[in-house]
């Protein structure tokens, strides 16, 4: 079964890109609540986040089996946010990410690299960035534009 084979060596074709850990740490030290909203089954996303050492940065890891509908529906995002948020955004790399953010009424930032078959600048995101280290600047620009 695919899931068993993939789970057996979950990090074989996965990598943590430059700047991810430092940026997540920066966001956390400033009080940001962070969630992973993925269409990857939770058993796999939990294992991948643990194996890469990233799980501790996130308040929630939400796979499709932990929500009412998978992306591009907004359920992942709305459930991860709960309520009472003043500023929120989605950082992703694909068309379903951008569509999910739009459906939730949130701005989106997409990476110019990742799993999208389409060029990042054609996905309709509010910002396209080329390094994860650019997330804080992109967020600041979004908040200024919405003020």
Regions found by a protein language model. Give the residues of each.
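Asp-based, Mg2+/Mn2+-dependent phosphohydrolase catalytic module
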Residues: 25, 29, 41-42, 46-147
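Short, flexible loop segments at the rims of nucleotide/cofactor-binding pockets, characterized by
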Residues: 11-14, 39, 68-69
